[in-house]
């Protein structure tokens, strides 16, 4: 994780993406999908960011932002973002740039 707040309710990580040039930053649409895999017979699939997880105890979300040369995946929670970060670790991220 690139950044984690002291209360662990916010964190993010950045990935260099040299394809996001000044022109892309100013004019393009960028979307991200996270691969969802399962240990049973459930078929794999892709889910688009942002992702929101709500239950009776807590709510967490993950979302995409970008700047010239990088993307940032941010996590927010009313408790700790640790579990959500663990869920995303090791998953394939698909980035779509439409310019």
For the regions a language model picked out, list residue spans one by one.
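First exposed extracellular module after export/assembly in secreted or surface-exposed proteins
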Residues: 1-99
């Amino acid at each position: 994780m690139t950044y984690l707040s002291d209360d662990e309710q916010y964190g993010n990580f950045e990935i260099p993406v040299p394809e996001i040039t000044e022109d892309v930053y100013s004019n393009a649409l960028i979307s991200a999908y996270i691969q969802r895999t399962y240990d049973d017979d459930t078929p794999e699939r892709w889910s688009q960011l942002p992702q929101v997880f709500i239950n009776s105890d807590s709510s967490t979300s993950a979302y995409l932002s970008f700047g010239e040369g990088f993307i940032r995946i941010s996590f927010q929670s009313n408790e700790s973002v640790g579990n959500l970060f663990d869920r995303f670790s090791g998953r394939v991220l698909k980035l779509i740039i439409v310019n």
